[in-house]
Amino acid sequence: MAWGCFVVLLLLAAAPLRLGQRLHLEPGFEYSYDCGVRGMQLLVFPRPNQTVQFKVLDEFGNRFEVNNCSICYHWVTSEAQEHTVFSADYKGCHVLEKDGRFHLRVFIQAVLPNGRVDIAQDVTLICPKPDHTVTPDPYLAPPTTPEPFTPHAFALHPIPDHTLAGSGHTGLTTLYPEQSFIHPTPAPPSLGPGPAGSTVPHSQWGTLEPWELTELDSVGTHLPQERCQVASGHIPCMVNGSSKETCQQAGCCYDSTKEEPCYYGNTVTLQCFKSGYFTLVMSQETALTHGVLLDNVHLAYAPNGCPPTQKTSAFVVFHVPLTLCGTAIQVVGEQLIYENQLVSDIDVQKGPQGSITRDSAFRLHVRCIFNASDFLPIQASIFSPQPPAPVTQSGPLRLELRIATDKTFSSYYQGSDYPLVRLLREPVYVEVRLLQRTDPSLVLVLHQCWATPTTSPFEQPQWPILSDGCPFKGDNYRTQVVAADREALPFWSHYQRFTITTFMLLDSSSQNALRGQVYFFCSASACHPLGSDTCSTTCDSGIARRRRSSGHHNITLRALDIVSSPGAVGFEDAAKLEPSGSSRNSSSRMLLLLLAITLALAAGIFVGLIWAWAQKLWEGIRY
């Protein structure tokens, strides 16, 4: 379906001066109101520390809160410590027409900082005022049906009014004043709905009329050449395509001789985009024409976080999302309406006896209207949430050391299975893991692992198994580090596994075997990778052969960092496990001695038998 978008801009230029004669509401509280061509305006002058609030009353006396509302044509503006302005269109909510005059009842209340209402009173606004005649306003006709999607350029002419009627359009739109704003001499204001004056007074010194406004004049035109004479600081126009027709239909200027042929002109340009953004561009020349400084221009309802996206000496650019920067959103039928205002703060010059300003009050009302029933493609991007921030404070670290039944590490011995029985050189499958941690970025790091003959990790003698996370080089049966299964384990970095070849500890002085059980211990910590630090340990592949012997293993870590095996590892037959040495040599000599004695006895018996047989044979021969 076609994409519909309507843009209406309201450009208000007013001086912060009085409107007509002030009327006393109560002591210290004054107001005045005036009637314009399209609406009425009420000015209230509060006392210090008072905040003015408005409510409108219907024909039955019911009160309704007043807010900036384009549907009801109600607008409230205020100047700090000066005055508060309530503007209402003759077509606005609760404006009643009686005998050719428009009536609006307004309830005014002044609220103190503590929330207490200080002053309150009803005021009835009647336009035109009773002593003036009414001139019919041809602009009060109902708006026409919006046209299909076509980018247009709007020309603005100054008229003494504060409401704009716009033709429907979509896409990229430029509004520009055809004439400079003129500060007219004070004159009686327009006293009822009627057409704009055909002449504009010449510039003279004096006070300013409260409203000098602009209205949409033409649709489908592009900027005149004089608006495209930008001396320096060209800003490329945000438009799809590079043709001259596309550029000019977007309300921008085109010059094929420039590096960026399509650029913004000396005017105010509003662009509404399907992507959910609007772009508002104002030139320095336009700001000076309306008596304001470009540095003081900002979005009226935006917080401090919505500064201009681009600012030069010649232009100020706002490119912001439709849903941010204080933009009001309304749904009317099948239309989505986004509204905001571009305003300028006045530059106040303070002297010893008072203050002055030479700036006008500038207010540009911007509105983007989209057809809510249109179908648009949507592209969704799903971003995984960031992992939680690492915990930096100290706390307990729960570790567990357990022994697996086989090299698959699929099952483990329970507490009742200890002490385990192993023969020399049989493998023992050891695993250390983190408990009660679900942070996938944590890495378990083993520092030292060792064995002792008792349940005390500080008992002597000791034998190192891992040194600084690597297999101890002095072992002729090097400990084998086993990589954790990344697919089978939910947090594989929380595990460290290695395989030990069983051994017996020797006494450091006598070198005799310490018959008994062996206990395993490890010191560990949890590491969080940061930058280039991956928490991994790089080990040297060199092998140094050395006979196991008990030595002092320096343990300086806190007890909370040390984890031990649930039980000991023992041996089935100590005699079978006797290491090679003097006792083994003694047994061999004994066997050899017994064998020698046996052979000697056998030889003696054999010799004796032969001797006896020889004697008998000799005696037989003699006789």
Curated annotation (Swiss-Prot):
Q: Which SUPFAM superfamilies match?
A: Trefoil
Q: In which tissues is it expressed?
A: Expressed in oocytes.
Superkingdom to which the source organism belongs: Eukaryota
What PTMs does it carry? Proteolytically cleaved before the transmembrane segment to yield the secreted ectodomain incorporated in the zona pellucida. O-glycosylated.
GO molecular function, one example? structural constituent of egg coat
- Glycosylated residues, per the record, are 49, 68, 240, 371, 554, 585
Q: Which residues lie on this side of the membrane: Extracellular?
A: 21-590
Give the modified residues of type Pyrrolidone carboxylic acid.
21
InterPro entries in UniProt: P_trefoil_CS, P_trefoil_dom, P_trefoil_dom_sf, Zona_Pellucida_Domain_gp, ZP-C, ZP-C_dom, ZP-N, ZP1/4_Ig-like
State the signal peptide span.
Answer: 1-20
Question: What are the entry keywords?
Answer: Cell membrane, Cleavage on pair of basic residues, Disulfide bond, Extracellular matrix, Fertilization, Glycoprotein, Membrane, Pyrrolidone carboxylic acid, Secreted, Signal, Transmembrane, Transmembrane helix
Which residue ranges does the entry give as Cytoplasmic-facing topology?
A: 612-623
Annotated Gene Ontology cellular component terms: collagen-containing extracellular matrix; egg coat; extracellular region; plasma membrane
Q: Which Pfam families match?
A: Trefoil, Zona_pellucida, ZP-N, ZP1_ZP4_Ig-like
Ranges for domain P-type come to 226-266
Region (Disordered) residue spans = 182-201
Q: How does it sit in the membrane?
A: Single-pass type I membrane protein
| UniProt-annotated location(s) | Cell membrane
User: Which parts of the sequence belong to the ZP domain?
Assistant: 271-542
Propeptide at which positions? 547-623
Q: List the disulfide bonds.
A: 228-253, 237-252, 247-262, 449-470
The entry assigns this protein to a family as follows: Belongs to the ZP domain family. ZPB subfamily.
What does this chain do? Component of the zona pellucida, an extracellular matrix surrounding oocytes which mediates sperm binding, induction of the acrosome reaction and prevents post-fertilization polyspermy. The zona pellucida is composed of 3 to 4 glycoproteins, ZP1, ZP2, ZP3, and ZP4. ZP1 ensures the structural integrity of the zona pellucida.
Record text on subunit structure and interactions: Polymers of ZP2 and ZP3 organized into long filaments cross-linked by ZP1 homodimers. Interacts with ZP3.
**Written domain comment of the UniProt record:** The ZP domain is involved in the polymerization of the ZP proteins to form the zona pellucida.
Identify this protein by name.
Zona pellucida sperm-binding protein 1
Organism field: Mus musculus (Mouse)
Q: Which gene encodes it?
A: Zp1
